[in-house]
């Protein structure tokens, strides 16, 4: 049992590793370089933004290793959530790292080059690891200590920040310099304010303190007349948001570097310790001019609360002379009935198509089942004046012993099933006519009394000369097609390849209604009505409401009806 647990554990560990090798990730061609200071703790975020609503996960790898960086916090280099931790950074940590974002449908990765730097000789920092920031002369602005928001404690507070200039402590006199959290406010910027500013703090991790240092290259730029900032987004708009969802609102401004861009809600600025709202700042210098920047302040809403629908979120940009604003109003999502309608229409269409296909394939079985199951519940039909359900028209034998299979089918098998098992009433010439009756009168009278005309076809009947040339056939087909409008059913006892030799009327009937082919034998034994031939024939017959005469009635080839003498089944009156 213990060995089985070990084996299952190994399988669970191997499956994710194998899947990592199999997956092919799309790589973003970003040229991202991170400079870290040796022997300092550092935390860096993946440049790719995961979508937690889609189940995105982030995994870090070093170099080309297929093994993810450990999530064990005792490891000097480890991953916590989507962040990569160096506790502390060493020179040998330099190299490139892959950040991979994946879910069940896609995989993205980006390459991050990490360089761990030692301090330059005679300095308390490395000049390669500086972050340039610019302020206008004679204006007010602020220097922001970059990439330190990850060091907030459980109360969402940063450690105390100490400021230095050119490695010497900076005097915060509250006249020219003000220290506010991770920002250094500079009043009335002057040329002599140029230099390298260091923001330093101590961060405690697992009971041990580590230094955190950032170097800002403060560059002064000439005084210039301020241009009015332009808010590109939002534009006084509304956004649908689901309650409890996580969304981002972006304030995109084109203006000066010193323009302040921030969000307000319900008349107040966003508090730094708000449990649901957090701001993130970005700026990008315009390539066309060094005096204009794209300033982006992102408001991250971790959970949309009901009160957020009451008041708009206001994007504010201001400088010493100008104040601009635009708002975003959150609204509840409007139900999208379009998708439901499309889905319902597709389902309905698919259902109809399936039903039509099923009906076409099983049409005969469905109709017969309906007749057998529901005929007793339907109201009785008014009499149509017909006596017979079908008149059987077949080639007459030329002498005794000829066409014995045909006679067996006509006088034995056909009545046995249709009359004996299903109660149909057939008129068969040679069985139901009386001695001495005129053929023309018998045919004319009984075709009119029949609901169907069943024509039986066989091969080798002298080019089918019997069809349409004798008086009986002519009268029967004429009455069925022209005078009475009776439905005609063609039965092939043998496969007939060439219908061109047949009369046009037969060709027309075959083309319009098709033909039913016999597939059984001619043994004189009880027939099963469940074969395809008998089902197709019953389908062409009228709906039967009478009970069958006998489900196992066997007919002889010389039937006697009532007390009158009938003609022998194998001998018939000559036609015409």
Curated annotation (Swiss-Prot):
Q: What class of enzyme is it?
A: hydrolase
Catalysed reaction(s)? NAD(+) + H2O = ADP-D-ribose + nicotinamide + H(+)
Query: Which organism's genome codes for this protein?
Result: Mus musculus (Mouse)
One Pfam family assigned to this protein is Ig_2
Mind listing the GO biological process terms from this record?
Answer: cytokine-mediated signaling pathway; inflammatory response; interleukin-1-mediated signaling pathway; positive regulation of canonical NF-kappaB signal transduction; positive regulation of interleukin-1-mediated signaling pathway; positive regulation of neutrophil extravasation; positive regulation of phosphatidylinositol 3-kinase/protein kinase B signal transduction; positive regulation of platelet-derived growth factor receptor signaling pathway
Q: Could you name the active-site residues?
A: 473
What's one GO-annotated cellular component? extracellular region
Family, according to the entry, reads as follows: Belongs to the interleukin-1 receptor family.
Question: Which residues are reported to carry the modification Phosphotyrosine?
Answer: 499
Q: What is its main location?
A: membrane
What are the TIR domain coordinates in residue numbering?
A: 386-541
Q: Which GO terms describe its molecular function?
A: interleukin-1 binding; interleukin-1 receptor activity; interleukin-1, type I, activating receptor activity; NAD+ nucleosidase activity, cyclic ADP-ribose generating; platelet-derived growth factor receptor binding; protease binding
Which residues, renumbered to this chain, are glycosylated?
63, 103, 174, 236, 252, 266, 300
Q: How does it sit in the membrane?
A: Single-pass type I membrane protein
What is this protein's function per UniProt?
A: Receptor for IL1A, IL1B and IL1RN. After binding to interleukin-1 associates with the coreceptor IL1RAP to form the high affinity interleukin-1 receptor complex which mediates interleukin-1-dependent activation of NF-kappa-B, MAPK and other pathways. Signaling involves the recruitment of adapter molecules such as TOLLIP, MYD88, and IRAK1 or IRAK2 via the respective TIR domains of the receptor/coreceptor subunits. Binds ligands with comparable affinity and binding of antagonist IL1RN prevents association with IL1RAP to form a signaling complex.
Protein name stated in the entry: Interleukin-1 receptor type 1
The record's note on quaternary structure and interaction partners says: The interleukin-1 receptor complex is a heterodimer of IL1R1 and IL1RAP. Interacts with PIK3R1. Interacts with IL1A.
Q: Which UniProt keywords apply?
A: Cell membrane, Disulfide bond, Glycoprotein, Hydrolase, Immunoglobulin domain, Inflammatory response, Membrane, NAD, Phosphoprotein, Receptor, Repeat, Secreted, Signal, Transmembrane, Transmembrane helix
Entry's localization field: Membrane; Cell membrane; Secreted
What does altering residue 134 to E do?
A: Results in impaired interaction with IL1RN
Entries under InterPro entries matching the protein:
Ig-like_dom, Ig-like_dom_sf, Ig-like_fold, Ig_I-set, Ig_sub, IL-1_rcpt_fam, IL-1_rcpt_I-typ, IL-1_rcpt_I/II-typ
Q: Can you quote the domain comment?
A: The TIR domain mediates NAD(+) hydrolase (NADase) activity. Self-association of TIR domains is required for NADase activity.
- Membrane side Extracellular: residue ranges: 20-338
Pinpoint the Ig-like C2-type domain residues.
25-115, 121-213, 229-329
- PANTHER family tied to this protein: INTERLEUKIN-1 RECEPTOR FAMILY MEMBER, INTERLEUKIN-1 RECEPTOR TYPE 1
- Where in the chain are disulfide-linked cysteines found? 25-107, 46-99, 145-199, 251-315
């Amino acid at each position: 049992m213990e060995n089985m647990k070990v084996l299952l554990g190994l399988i669970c560990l191997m499956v994710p590793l194998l899947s990592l090798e199999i997956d092919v990730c799309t790589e973003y061609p970003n040229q991202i370089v991170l400079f870290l200071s040796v022997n300092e703790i550092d935390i860096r975020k993946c440049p790719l933004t995961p979508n937690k609503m889609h189940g995105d996960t982030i995994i870090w790898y070093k170099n080309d290793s297929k093994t993810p960086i450990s999530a064990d916090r005792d490891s000097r280099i480890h991953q916590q959530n989507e962040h990569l931790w160096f506790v502390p950074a060493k020179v040998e940590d330099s190299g490139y790292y892959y950040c991979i974002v994946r879910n069940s449908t896609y995989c993205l990765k980006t390459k991050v080059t990490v360089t761990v730097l030692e301090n330059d000789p005679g300095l308390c920092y490395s000049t390669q690891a500086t972050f340039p920031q610019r302020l206008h002369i004679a204006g007010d602005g602020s220097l922001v200590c970059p990439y330190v928001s990850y060091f907030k404690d459980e109360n969402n507070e940063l450690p105390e920040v100490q400021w230095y200039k050119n490695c010497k402590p900076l005097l915060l006199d509250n006249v020219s310099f003000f220290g506010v959290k991770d920002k250094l406010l500079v009043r009335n910027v002057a040329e002599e304010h140029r230099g390298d500013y260091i923001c330093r703090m101590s961060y405690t991790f697992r009971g041990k303190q580590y230094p955190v240092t950032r170097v800002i290259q403060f560059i002064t730029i000439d005084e210039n007349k301020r241009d009015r900032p332009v808010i590109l987004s939002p534009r006084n708009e509304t956004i649908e948001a689901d309650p409890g969802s996580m969304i981002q609102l972006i304030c995109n401004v084109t203006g000066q570097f010193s323009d302040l861009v921030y969000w307000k809600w319900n008349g107040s600025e966003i508090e730094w310790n708000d449990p649901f709202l957090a701001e993130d700042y970005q700026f990008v210098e315009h390539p066309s001019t060094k005096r204009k920047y794209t300033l982006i302040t992102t408001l991250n809403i971790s959970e949309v609360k009901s009160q957020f629908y009451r008041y708009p979120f206001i994007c504010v940009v201001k400088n010493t002379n100008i104040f601009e604003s635009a708002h975003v109003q959150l609204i509840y999502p409007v139900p999208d009935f379009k998708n439901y309608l499309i889905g319902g229409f597709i389902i309905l269409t698919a259902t109809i198509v399936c039903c039509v296909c099923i009906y076409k394939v099983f049409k005969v079985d469905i109709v017969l089942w309906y007749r057998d199951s529901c005929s007793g519940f339907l109201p009785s039909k008014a009499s149509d004046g017909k006596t017979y359900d079908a008149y059987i028209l077949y080639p007459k034998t030329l002498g005794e012993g000829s066409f014995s299979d045909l006679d067996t089918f006509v006088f034995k098998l056909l009545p046995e099933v249709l009359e004996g098992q299903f109660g149909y009433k057939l008129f068969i010439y040679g069985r139901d006519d009386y001695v001495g009756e005129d053929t023309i009168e018998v045919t004319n009278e009984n075709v009119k009394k029949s609901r169907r005309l069943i024509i039986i076809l066989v091969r080798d009947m002298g080019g089918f000369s019997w069809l349409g040339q004798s008086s009986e056939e002519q009268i029967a087909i004429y009455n069925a097609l022209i005078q009475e409008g009776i439905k005609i059913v063609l039965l092939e006892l043998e496969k007939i390849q060439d219908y061109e030799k047949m009369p046009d009327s037969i060709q027309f009937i075959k083309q319009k209604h098709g033909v039913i082919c016999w597939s059984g034998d001619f043994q004189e034994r009880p027939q099963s009505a469940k074969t395809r031939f008998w089902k197709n024939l019953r389908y062409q017959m009228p709906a039967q409401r009478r009970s069958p005469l006998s489900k196992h009635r066997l007919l002889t080839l010389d039937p006697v009806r009532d007390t009158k003498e009938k003609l022998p089944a194998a001998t018939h009156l000559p036609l015409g």
